[in-house]
Amino acid sequence: MKFNNRNVLISSSAKIGDNVKIGDNTVIYDNVIIEDNVTICNDCVIGEPLSSYYSDENYQNPPTLIGKDSVIRSHSIIYANSTFGEGFSTGHRVTIRENSKFGKFCRIGTVSDIQGFVEFGDYCWLHSNVHIGQKST
């Protein structure tokens, strides 16, 4: 995949590590931290604001952390206030809602939907088309 740097929007408050590749048409919102050696493919949204963004004029985006050596594949949306450990990876078209926490070396398959307020430990692997409801244990 070529990285053409077309239509990439990165908030001035985002922190981007070394050797990070960001695909075309990707948005990185406020308070996102992307550690070293991360690849974010085309058409992704990282740090998607929470619903109060649309009604609270004093809204501040909570932090979102993408750990080093992670890969976020195309058309994935990751909401704010989530944390992903080292070596995290997604398939294509993954949605991960707010308040999600994933440990090291976790994988989420293509077209999966994580509805937020969840926590996964290290080395978890969710295959394609998985739906995890909010606050699942």
Regions found by a protein language model. Give the residues of each.
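Basic/polar N-terminal segments that are highly enriched at the extreme N-terminus
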Residues: 1-2
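Left-handed beta-helix
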Residues: 5-6, 11-12, 17-18, 23-24, ...
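Intrinsically disordered, low-complexity Ser/Thr- and acidic-rich flexible linkers and loops
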Residues: 51-61
